[in-house]
Amino acid sequence: MTTQGLILRRLAAGLLAIACCAPFLSAQQLRVTYEYKYHPYKNENRLNADMDMTLDIEKGRTAFYSETEFMSDSLGCIAFNDNGETVDQDAYGKLTRLSRGSCKDYILIENGNTARVQLSDGILHLSYSDTYVQPEWTIEEGNYSYRGYTTHKATCHFMGRDWIAWYTEEIPSSAGPWLLSGLPGLILKAQDSEMLFDFSYRYISAIEDTDSRYEQLSSFFIPRPDERKYFFSGSSKEMGLLYDKIKNDASLENQLLGIISSKTLNKDGSLSDQAPKERISIIPVEYWKSK
């Protein structure tokens, strides 16, 4: 190949790379998928991982949710009527075959200043709306390469935990996973200082107006008639404290769900009290108590 031909080939490859990246660099609406790893219980090495935590970035609003949970709730709306009766066998069949993730929370942020949060275990749903205040970040010097992007490191103390984040200015969005945002570029990775919670970018795509899920996600905050007894709403402090109490008190959770006993069935057929496990919440209960 001649020198001129080689130059033209390299130029064409460069232009193609720019064209492929352009939609992400200029798009105002993006869908970012993260892997979310966390330790659910104290004094245990168990690690949960959700591979499909999704951040939708739209004009003036963001949504953070599990793709699997979104599909589950969407199919549930089709499969059942308001009385909980099965009305669509096809949707019901897909729902029963769906593998559920462990994180079932929804977070919607509108206009950068109002957060709607639903804490859920799949049955109990606690929701609140509150003024959203972005973390106050300290940006450190230096560049870091992360999955093909040049990133910068930032730290903050936010909602009871110390956080470390890596963001890229190559994607001009101040959004990030969970309630983390406010940096001069998309947050690709974030973890707390104790390494109990970790969000890691997996892939990104542009979304069209017709593919917006925001309104549908908003509808999941409204209880269906057959689920009303499992929905609670109030201030952020009330719901944060209630969620912590329910998840750390098996007898209270069972009482709310109408389960008579919280005992464990042993192999010999006898019953014994469940050993209490202390959950680790991404927002520590101490934060809610001090609020």
PLM feature segments, named:
Residues Y146-R147, F158:
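Structural motif
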Residues M1-Y34:
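Bacterial Sec-dependent N-terminal signal peptides
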Residues C21-Q29, E110, S173-P184:
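Short, surface-exposed loop and linker segments with low hydrophobicity and enrichment for Pro/Ser/Thr
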Residues C20-C21, C77, C103, C156:
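Generic recognition of cysteine residues
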Residues A154-L217:
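Gly/Pro-enriched, hydrophobic low-complexity segments
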